[in-house]
């Protein structure tokens, strides 16, 4: 099974993947985030945040309040399963999480929590056999 994925978020506020599948056979899963754009992180920064679908809006709202210094993620937010730091153009970051944190049949969302980005920059993550 492929236990990692590469995803890019660009200056046009788009992720290059709308869906990520994670195999149950993976113990851990790694997301490699790349920003192929040119704009700095304070202007057009992107991160990759994973929550349950139902938790996305709350995590986005609290993340905005947390600010750039906290990567637009509320400190110790139990709703956030995994997240990268906020990166700017030309930068990369990775995050690895335990697949045991995912439940079969649950709907998971990934998104960028930079203010105003999540409406366009989001996708679905699924646990598969």
From Swiss-Prot:
A Pfam entry, by short name: Copper-bind
Annotated Cu cation binding sites: 46, 112, 117, 121
Keyword Lyase attached: no
Segments traversing the membrane: none
Localization (cell): Periplasm
Molecular-function GO terms, alphabetical: copper ion binding; electron transfer activity
Keyword flag Disulfide bond: yes
Keywords attached to this entry: Copper, Disulfide bond, Electron transport, Metal-binding, Periplasm, Transport
Chief location: periplasm
Cited function: Transfers electrons from cytochrome c551 to cytochrome oxidase.
Disulfide bonds: 3-26
Domain Plastocyanin-like per the UniProt entry, residue ranges: 1-129
Any one of the GO CC terms: periplasmic space
Name of the protein in its database record: Azurin-1
Originating species: Alcaligenes xylosoxydans xylosoxydans
